Amino acid sequence: MRLCTAGRLKQLQGGLVNKAIEIKKLGQLEVLKASVPYTQDPTRLFHTICENKTDSLLLESAEIDSKQNLKSLLIVDSAVRIVCYGHTVSFHALTENGKNLLTHVNQNVRGEVASQFDGETLTLEFIQPCDTIDEDSRLREASSFDALRLVQHSFDLSSQDKHAIFLGGLFAYDLVANFEPLGDAVATNQCPDYVFYVAETLLVVDHQTESCQLQATLFVDGSQKAALESRIEDIRAQCTSPKRLPDATQVANITAQPSVPDQDFCQIVRDLKEFVVKGDIFQVVPSRRFTLPCPSPLAAYKELKQSNPSPYMFYMQDELFTLFGASPESALKYETDTNQIEIYPIAGTRRRGKRPNGEIDFDLDSRIELELRSDKKENAEHMMLVDLARNDVARISQAGTRHVADLLKVDRYSHVMHLVSRVVGQLRDDLDALHAYQACMNMGTLTGAPKIRAMQLIRDVEGARRGSYGGAVGYLTGEGTLDTCIVIRSAYVENGIAQVQAGAGVVFDSDPQAEADETRGKAQAVISAIQAAHSQPANKE
């Protein structure tokens, strides 16, 4: 039988499971709730309530086929910012409520983990996992993932809302380098290995029922209750009349500059094919960056949402960067209620069939789909990644529960169509969603197979950290649910400059120019959205 949340907490309290956490006492929570007027456009809510405030996050979902909005989750205020660099994790209290949270969770850190706490910042130092022990044992070693578990498990959730503890944020692609020997790489931006926010005020917008609920979580005691009640009234008032987005800063003749020109990228593809011929790998996914001005990222995100609605859409406003995107692909999903773990591999891409005026030519589009489904190379590449997903899911699932729920479907987006599949299983009783993510990172569609060797080759040819690209953005709840998407079809923005990164799967019979073209095709939806947003007024309905 599956361990419920309380069962997991008992194990942690007894010190039987976790080497970094010892629950000495469960803290108390109080969740304050209020209904607010429904708004169809969450970007207007974000602009109205958050504007330029950092440590805020908007997560949105849409139905794949109809493109209808489903739900939007907005972290308005964060109590704590959790940031990981290498094996060092720092918790920064952003409010008095956040200080109360840190004071409590600090009591539950095991003595074996080096820690320092000054009342506002808690720093944990983890050690490099031993690479001589087996994979299962490595999952149980103390690691930077335990910093997130510390918040998850330090409070009594027995009678609380599922979002009472809500952590939203980003796992960078390079987080895996803390666990696997990938080699050195330079940084092209300031992206940490991960950054998560513990929500203090959370806005939940249900587009199906056209309802909107605001909640605030009071940690440990009631000392900040009056302040939170006042903040709720503040936000409610702002939600009654959401402001239109201001006009985006106009930029003339925006062009995207590739980090690697076509000729050089083609040579990278040829070089990597040699490793396929030698049998080192079956597939590898090199990428390149396209940079362009993006002084108004929220306007660009709104344009991207309208032009390329996707199952996962996100806008993250950190103190170091802004990240936005419309991703077609789930990274890893775990639902506590069903105990199901899920990976959604996407591989096999074609441009949409369009007329010269840009409208979809449905007859041409259908013929392109047929050609995609019939392409032996694309099918072989896709099935290779389905097998990789099957292996990943099998390692963390109960015996006999892993299966392929969907195989070789076609999902359509504004500029491209993809072959997609879905692999599911029942998570083992001795693991949680973070164990599952650690075991599976990074997703095979952004690495190749075998995964570790492919990631090493990617480091060799790219020479730089990928940062957010190929990582995962999403949320984790106190009761254990994890929902993340792969950070693709996205823009990472620092100092008004966007980095749009895209890759292509290289196999034995890859055509170098076709792979270079594929990176442009995948990046185009985001590039076009940035260009469109900065060449016209943003405040359209």
UniProtKB/Swiss-Prot annotation:
One GO MF annotation is: anthranilate synthase activity
- The record's EC number reads 4.1.3.27
The pathway to which it is assigned is: Amino-acid biosynthesis; L-tryptophan biosynthesis; L-tryptophan from chorismate: step 1/5
Would the keyword Transit peptide be found if you checked this record's keyword annotation? no
Cofactor binding mode, per the note?
Binds 1 Mg(2+) ion per subunit.
UniProt-annotated binding residues for Mg(2+): E381, E518
Regulation of its activity: Feedback inhibited by tryptophan.
Q: NCBIfam families, alphabetically?
A: PRK13564.1 (NF010079), trpE_proteo (TIGR00565)
Quote the protein name from its UniProt record. Answer: Anthranilate synthase component 1
What is the organism field in this record? Vibrio parahaemolyticus serotype O3:K6 (strain RIMD 2210633)
